[in-house]
């Protein structure tokens, strides 16, 4: 038999004649040859697509795959620290790149960390870059028409009213008194219980409870009692946290997908629906109760919480705000006041343990302030329970610098979103079309050598000091509190809250992270620690405090 003749076949022989062959062996070989040719064709197509996608990476920062766009790279980034991944991409692309999502998806966006671009969209061309429909639709179920999800007149009205209230004497008195109560009569006893039992404690959870109670007092005028000796589970607090966690998933998922999940009531959409019901039930009950109380009191000015203030106002038609609108206002302020400060403090204490020289300088600064009191003396310096007053808190420049440095490296809101209202061009030359989405990466901004220098990854509070006094940076370089017309209204209060809490803890305890505890950010609206912050607390001895007190006489020690 001539075996060579079995392989000497034409294309037509393979695809049209093989079935008529009477030789089973030849038939099998023909089918095998056809399969090999198809496989070779598929491999060639894959190699071509891969080479094309990788070539696109040179110009667009990431490979661009047919149909999928840059989604595979995003999926890879989501497996680890998504914010570090994004920072690396932005660094390679000189601060700006255009993300391409799957075909027919809503994930296309321009991402930037260039301060020139950030100032352009937050200040110079503010009216061209509203939150936009994409952002509002993703968070409408949770935030409704509240200040962080609103644009135009709705946003302006809420901001104007809140701004007046935030600067009132009654509001400052409310915040000062409520914070003192929470820190010295609830927080410290909880921490002391942990010390006495020699058991670790989740400091992030404790701080979230503290700020949650504090902001509920300010926003709703109620005390949920979240921070207590037995660390009770508060349904509203749990529902609120679950809702924010589920809502953020919409930003990394095509709109059609999460809407389909919502229709089927499955996955994160089911969780979001259930959580928002818990939030709404709490808010509705508070609003109903407050209306009854005010009808009996007959005068809204006796209270200074935001809910009562807005209840006393009228809309453009002269009518009272709806319960839904009141709910949206309060939920938005709780989101801002609860998460941002507590998350920032958690990262601050983690960084503090890694940088003991910073902790020492904070202690020296506090001892110096105690020494400067009119009634200072040996009794004062050895007093283990000092209470720092508002004016003394303001003098803590180095502590504020350390907190700002923590916020630079780990901003509470790592990214934020805008939508382009009309065709525009960024200062760096990036072209923007009407309807485009823009993301400014606040986390990445703190890690750019071009912005902060070669030591940008170091925790160095001294970069914020000028002749020993705290000096803030441009809001378009340090964007932890946003910038332009949307600059955070509660910035001063947030610093006061963080400084008061940090001072009370640092002066009394050394905070040591539990060995082996993994610290990494969680994908959420704010940058929670994914596994909390498990720490052991150690009481400071009087002799240790005396050593810091002695160093406080050296005027140049902190600088």
From Swiss-Prot:
CDD domains: CYP86A (cd11064). The keyword Lyase does not apply. Its cofactor is heme. Disruption phenotype: No visible vegetative growth phenotype. Very large reduction in alpha, omega-bifunctional C22 to C24 saturated suberin components in seeds. No effect on seed coat permeability. GO terms for cellular component: endoplasmic reticulum; endoplasmic reticulum membrane. The chain crosses the membrane at residues 31-51. Belongs to the cytochrome P450 family. Involved in very long chain fatty acids (VLCFA) omega-hydroxylation. Required for the synthesis of saturated VLCFA alpha, omega-bifunctional suberin monomers. This is Cytochrome P450 86B1. It comes from Arabidopsis thaliana (Mouse-ear cress). The lineage of its organism: Eukaryota, Viridiplantae, Streptophyta, Embryophyta, Tracheophyta. The gene is CYP86B1.
